[in-house]
């Protein structure tokens, strides 16, 4: 189920232009990552997909249908949404949180609860946590519940707004790997927002680097962007999030490519194990999108 932005702009009442003439195709069953600094319009773009924000001009199409003609509430209920800090209802159990949207769409309680328990398995949580409340969970567990809730109605589209930004680095790495596993198994159309270029390169099949006003500085596969930054802005953006190093790619044998920093030292290797791009730095390998 592809998503298409056609010349979309968003101007707020105070005159702020959050999005200026933005066009993009989000391919079906792939992960597209919108990455940029604060004020780049990435979250506004995400929120326009499920009509939490309305474009000032332009069109957004889902499966070739203009969502401006869709009723907002039913639209939102068929699109998964995962946010930072999980957004769980504190007075409801884990089971009830995950089962909320299915129940709202008319699924009987027993079936909704069974689906919720299955999703706890899917996101790697013990079913014994089902009767706990969010405050009784760790930050990583809360985020996993948030992902389970986003998947509860088996949506074709999953929107993720900096979902791992509030957890510690170790938990974040675990959650990123879990998302890669889930996407490999489920094949959703994922739109993921982050300010972290490393996270974008790790998770994205398509990475879209944004400047102010959601102007596209560069879009493409992580390997393409690393090999050929489109501008000084892109090169700088990549360098800042890598300890102010500018990375370039030297091609090696086969599908491997050597990452070289600005001083000429090797920073890692891009490999393609099993057809998926990965970063290999020292002895650690992390998946990074379809090659």
What are these regions, as identified by a protein language model?
Residues 50:
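Helix-to-loop junction immediately C-terminal to a conserved catalytic motif
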Residues 66-80, 104, 109-110:
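ABC ATPase NBD coupling module
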Residues 110-128:
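Conserved ABC ATPase "signature" region
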Residues 133-137, 141-143:
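Conserved ABC ATPase signature
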């Amino acid at each position: 189920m592809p998503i298409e932005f056609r010349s979309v702009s968003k101007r707020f009442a105070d005159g702020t232009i959050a999005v200026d003439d933005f066009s993009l195709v989000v391919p079906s069953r792939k992960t597209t990552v919108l990455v940029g600094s604060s004020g780049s319009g990435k979250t506004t773009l995400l929120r326009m997909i499920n009509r939490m924000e309305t474009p000032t001009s332009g069109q957004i199409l889902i499966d070739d249908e203009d969502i401006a003609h869709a009723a907002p509430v039913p639209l939102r209920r068929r699109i998964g949404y995962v946010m930072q800090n999980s957004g769980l209802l504190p007075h409801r159990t884990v089971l009830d949180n995950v089962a909320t949207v299915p129940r709202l769409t008319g699924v009987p309680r027993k079936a909704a609860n069974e689906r919720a328990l299955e999703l706890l398995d899917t996101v790697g949580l013990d079913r014994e946590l089902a009767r706990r409340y969010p405050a009784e969970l760790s930050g990583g567990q809360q985020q996993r519940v948030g992902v389970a809730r986003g998947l509860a109605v088996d949506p074709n589209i999953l929107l993720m707004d900096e979902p791992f930004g509030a957890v510690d680095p170790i938990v974040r790495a675990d959650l990123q790997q879990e998302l890669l596993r889930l996407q490999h198994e489920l094949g959703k159309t994922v739109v993921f927002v982050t300010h972290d270029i490393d996270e974008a390169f790790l998770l994205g099949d398509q990475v879209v680097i944004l400047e102010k006003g959601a102007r596209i500085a560069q879009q493409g596969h992580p390997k393409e962007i690393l090999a050929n930054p489109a501008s000084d802005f892109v090169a700088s953006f990549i360098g800042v999030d890598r300890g102010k190093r500018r990375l370039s790619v030297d091609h090696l044998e086969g599908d491997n490519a050597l990452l070289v920093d600005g001083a000429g030292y090797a920073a890692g290797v891009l490999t393609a194990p099993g057809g998926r791009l990965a970063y290999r730095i020292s002895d650690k390998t992390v998946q990074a999108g379809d090659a």
